[in-house]
């Protein structure tokens, strides 16, 4: 949520008129704020990476056109985050009739109760101020979502008080009417039952509410946003065609197309309890991208960005665990910590039916490919020949859960006048013992994958040697 400034002090309709306030339709409000930010050179979409040239321009055009929007994409593509960011285009504070059920504008009451109050109290009608964070409402669609949840129902308590069933004031409004003058976002839209989709259809197109056989016309001012899986959002899927037709913009999302964007998302979203060097984040990002390209993985389910994020958090936790057990002053993740991530992340991937029993083999192969690609990318031009020669002469370097960064560095063989280590550490920006040990492990693992050195793993310890 955004950091709020203090709300205005105006407290009555009369004061609001005197201040020159004008009521503005929701879509005009969003359009004006978006245009103002674009003209000022500001970024209306903070924290979104990889959509700058694809999704965001489409969203901006849809908002300028005043369209309801549905985002189509696989899981973990940032659809929900993008929907939430749209709320940042609302005015920070907006006036509402104090105590009004539907956050009505003081100049434009729409319910019978608010109209009566406005007529009776005139300029002395009390107002309050609503922050934009309160004007965004989100609902995860599930098959058991009811019309009462989204649209409303008759309130039996009000009927018991003596009001008739046809009295509009007997209605307990649902999520969409309560989002009047705001944004309602529905995730996984096709999961709604067909009768709920029909009810939404009336609200979006006709702006009327049908409850228990009678119709209440309300000039609702709501921007409807939704997300859906592309497979479900078709005439053959679980979406009714008339509702599909009501969304002015269907926008396809995607996973980050550039490696740098994938790393940036992970760095931004992961809650890391220890330092994770950039080269490890790159490995995890490449690992995720390899999974998305693998024929062994069910691509209909996708490989979420949350996979990379969870991997980074697990790697950091492994480093912190080692630092605590070995009484290290700093916790820095190394190549050895990737094994812990693979062990716990496999369950997040759905494999094709013919891959039963090969899941771990596939994960290990794709991770090694990611490491090799990262080594080629980051260490290109560094001559590791002296290190290979030292290992061929019998040197060994041990690492593992029980091995500290200092132990790894002490085990590195002396290379005479060769500046291999200095060049390696400088290339990766490694200054502390932990960062240097992580850099050394990356180089050793790269040499192993290139079949320049050997590697033996047993009992929680890995030894690089002949």
Show which residues each predicted segment covers:
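Conserved C-terminal "switch" segment of AAA+ ATPases
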Residues: 5-10, 19-33, 233-238, 244-301, ...
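Dynamic helix-loop-helix/coil hinge segments at AAA+ ATPase domain boundaries and subdomain interfaces
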Residues: 17-25, 36-55
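Phosphate-binding P-loop
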Residues: 51-52, 60-66, 74-75, 176-179, ...
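Short hydrophobic/aromatic beta-strand immediately N-terminal to the Walker A/P-loop
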Residues: 69-72, 185
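Conserved glycine(s) of the Walker
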Residues: 78-79
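Hydrophobic positions on the alpha1 helix immediately C-terminal to the Walker A/P-loop
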Residues: 82, 86
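Canonical AAA+ ATPase core
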Residues: 90-128, 132-175, 180-273, 317-326
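C-terminal engagement/docking regions of AAA+ P-loop ATPases
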Residues: 300, 320-466
């Amino acid at each position: 949520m955004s950091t709020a400034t203090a709300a205005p002090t105006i407290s009555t309709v009369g004061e609001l008129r005197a201040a020159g306030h004008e009521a503005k339709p929701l879509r005009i409000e969003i359009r004006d704020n978006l245009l103002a930010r674009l003209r000022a050179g500001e970024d209306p979409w903070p924290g979104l990476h990889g959509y700058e040239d694809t999704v965001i321009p489409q969203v901006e055009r849809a908002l300028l056109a005043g369209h309801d929007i549905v985002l189509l994409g696989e899981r973990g593509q940032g659809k929900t985050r993008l929907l939430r960011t749209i709320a940042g285009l609302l005015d920070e504070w907006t006036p509402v009739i104090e105590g009004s059920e539907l956050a009505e504008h003081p100049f434009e009451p729409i319910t019978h109760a608010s109209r009566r109050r406005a007529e009776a109290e005139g300029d002395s009608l009390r107002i309050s101020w609503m922050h934009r964070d309160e004007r965004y409402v989100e609902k995860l669609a599930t098959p058991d979502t009811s019309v009462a949840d989204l649209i409303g129902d008759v309130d039996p308590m009000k009927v018991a008080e003596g009001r008739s069933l046809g009295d509009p004031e007997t209605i307990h409004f649902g999520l969409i009417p309560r989002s009047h003058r705001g944004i309602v976002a529905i995730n996984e839209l096709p999961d709604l039952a067909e009768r709920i989709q029909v009810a939404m259809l009336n609200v979006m197109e006709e702006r009327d509410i049908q409850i228990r056989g009678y119709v209440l016309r309300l000039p609702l001012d709501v921007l409807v946003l939704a997300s859906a899986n592309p497979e479900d959002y078709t005439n053959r899927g679980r979406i009714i065609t008339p509702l599909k037709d009501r969304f002015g913009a269907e926008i396809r999302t995607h996973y980050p197309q550039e490696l740098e964007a994938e790393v940036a998302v992970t760095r931004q979203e992961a809650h890391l309890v220890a330092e994770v060097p950039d080269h490890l984040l790159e490995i995890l990002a490449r690992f995720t991208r390899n999974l998305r390209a693998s024929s062994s993985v069910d691509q209909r389910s996708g490989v979420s960005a949350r996979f990379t994020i969870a991997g980074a958090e697990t790697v950091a936790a492994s480093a912190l665990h080692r630092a605590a057990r070995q009484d290290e002053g700093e916790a820095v993740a190394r190549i050895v910590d990737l094994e812990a991530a693979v062990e716990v992340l496999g369950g997040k991937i759905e494999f094709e039916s013919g891959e039963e029993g090969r899941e771990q083999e596939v994960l290990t192969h794709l991770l090694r490919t990611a490491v090799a690609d990262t080594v080629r990318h980051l260490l290109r031009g560094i001559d590791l020949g002296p290190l290979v020669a030292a290992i061929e002469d019998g040197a060994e370097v041990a690492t593992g859960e029980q091995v500290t960064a200092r132990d790894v560095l002490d085990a590195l063989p002396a290379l005479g006048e060769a500046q291999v280590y200095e060049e390696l550490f400088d290339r990766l920006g490694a200054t502390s013992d932990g960062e240097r040990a992580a850099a050394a492990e990356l180089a050793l693992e790269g040499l192993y994958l290139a079949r320049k050195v050997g590697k033996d793993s047993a009992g929680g310890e890995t030894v690089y040697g002949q």
